[in-house]
From Swiss-Prot:
SUPFAM superfamilies: Enolase C-terminal domain-like, Enolase N-terminal domain-like. Catalyzes the reversible conversion of 2-phosphoglycerate (2-PG) into phosphoenolpyruvate (PEP). It is essential for the degradation of carbohydrates via glycolysis. Mg(2+) binds at residues 246, 289, 316. The gene is eno. InterPro entries: Enolase, Enolase-like_C_sf, Enolase-like_N, Enolase_C, Enolase_CS, Enolase_N. Pfam families: Enolase_C (PF00113), Enolase_N (PF03952). The active site is at 209 (proton donor), 341 (proton acceptor). Pathway: Carbohydrate degradation; glycolysis; pyruvate from D-glyceraldehyde 3-phosphate: step 4/5. It comes from Shewanella denitrificans (strain OS217 / ATCC BAA-1090 / DSM 15013). This is Enolase. Component of the RNA degradosome, a multiprotein complex involved in RNA processing and mRNA degradation. GO terms for molecular function: magnesium ion binding; phosphopyruvate hydratase activity. Belongs to the enolase family. Its main location: cytoplasm.
Length: 431
């Protein structure tokens, strides 16, 4: 047994200059796992609670000392002597200790940091990489794949101080032979886009996730400049590279309408879905995330009906990595893919359950970072260890994003042909 002999929590900083929670789990054999909780900007209302102190005299109320105290107090006491390899048992102990539906007593940030740190420590004690341990926990030992990256090269919405309403415009290097080549393609397009924006006299400042954040005349113009950048980088749009959007539509849903303030347009629910479909008819958009508000289930049914057979429709705020909500979506034929964010649900065990449920229902699962990140690269191992097939971890800029890409490079080097890169086949509706 990999017995836990100590659990330590601390307050560290995330990529936006806000505090977050880091945890260490120490085992009897001298193994130490360490992990940090990320934090989102555009958040679903049903996400597990990120516990903040609310003390305006520290970090504008965003301190996490209470969450840290929970780790160093009741969580540590409950986990001492337990087997770190028994992930489901550890997570259930913390869930029961919290006793609330959304982890608002101990904080999902506290529980998640310990959950991931325990997994890392257990992997070390077994002498195997984290991705291999995750595959075993997932019930799929030895089954791996390298994910297709969704690279967020233009930021808007809550991730940038510009007039672009849609939050993320992403490129997917689906024509690459392997992950290393995909990463190179994305980097070259990113640098090409910088030159295109500069030539138009547009800003090349970056947003929270490392993508450029220029002011543009419309959301369609963002797609147009990306098309130019892809072509000037020497690639063919629609063959080598496809496009993906994260609308984060909940952020501009007001009084039953979708208000694109940046371009002065207001749509009803079906009208906004039709607008997105028109963009997908003009450009090779193969994935759209949160194309409607999290509560607009009737609208989601329409969007799935008109686009779900050809385009991957990803539920982020819609499903919040929650199996109960995902079950409802599957039963009602809502969307066809789920975004997976550890901290929306608050433990590794519950995260793996959501991925398995999605796959069993024929949905895809897209592993994702948050806009507030750290150097922690666990999501890279999660993507490979569950053979999820797709990952969102920002642009080729900002060390908090690049850390995940670099970890994926290391993993691909280790696994070689055991972790194939399947490109377009990984995306719902494209196989």
């Amino acid at each position: 047994m990999a017995n836990i002999i100590n659990v330590i929590g601390r307050e560290i900083m995330d990529s936006r200059g806000n505090p977050t929670v880091e945890a260490e789990v120490h085992l009897a054999g001298g193994f130490i796992g360490m992990a940090a909780a990320p934090s989102g900007a555009s958040t679903g209302s049903r996400e597990a609670l990120e516990l903040r102190d609310g003390d305006k005299s520290r970090y504008l109320g965003k301190g996490v000392l209470n969450a840290v105290a929970n780790i160093n107090g009741v969580i540590k006491a409950a986990l001492m002597g337990k087997d770190a390899a028994a992930q489901a048992e550890l997570d259930q102990i913390m869930i029961d200790l919290d006793g609330t539906e959304n982890k608002d007593k101990l904080g999902a940030n506290a529980i998640l940091a310990v959950s991931l740190a325990a997994a890392k420590a257990a992997a070390m004690s077994k002498g195997i990489p984290l991705y291999a341990h995750i595959a075993e926990l997932n019930g799929t030992p030895g089954v791996y794949s390298m994910p297709v990256p969704m690279m967020n090269i233009i930021n808007g919405g809550e991730h940038a101080d510009n007039n672009v309403d849609i939050q993320e415009f992403m490129v997917q290097p689906v024509g690459a032979k392997n992950f290393r080549e995909a990463l190179r393609m994305g980097a070259e397009i990113f640098h090409s886009l910088k030159k295109v924006l500069q030539s138009k006299g547009l800003s090349t400042a970056v947003g929270d996730e490392g993508g450029f954040a220029p002011n543009l005349a419309s959301n369609a113009e963002a797609l147009a400049v990306i098309k130019v950048a892809v072509e000037e980088a020497g690639y063919k749009l629609g063959t080598d590279v496809t496009l993906a959007l994260d609308c984060a539509a909940t952020e501009f849903y007001k009084d039953g309408k979708y208000d694109l303030a940046g371009e002065g347009k207001v749509f009803d629910s079906n009208g906004f879905s039709d607008f997105l479909k028109s963009l997908a008819d003009q450009y090779p958009i193969v994935s759209i995330e949160d194309g409607l508000d999290e509560s607009d289930w009737e609208g989601w049914a329409y969007q799935t009906k008109i686009m779900g057979d050809k385009i991957q429709l990803v539920g982020d705020d819609l499903f919040v990595t929650n199996t109960k909500i995902l079950t409802r979506g599957i039963e009602n034929n809502i969307a066809n893919s789920i975004l997976i964010k550890f901290n929306q649900i608050g433990s590794l065990t519950e995260t793996l359950a959501a991925i398995r449920m999605a796959k069993e229902a024929g949905y895809t699962a897209v592993i994702s970072h948050r806009s507030g990140e750290t150097e922690d690269s666990t999501i890279a191992d999660l993507a490979v260890g569950t053979a999820a097939g797709q990952i969102k971890t920002g642009s080729l800029c900002r060390s908090d994003r690049v850390a995940k890409y670099n970890q994926l490079l290391r993993i691909e080097e280790q696994l070689g042909e055991k972790a194939p890169y399947r490109g377009l086949k990984e995306i719902k509706g494209q196989a």
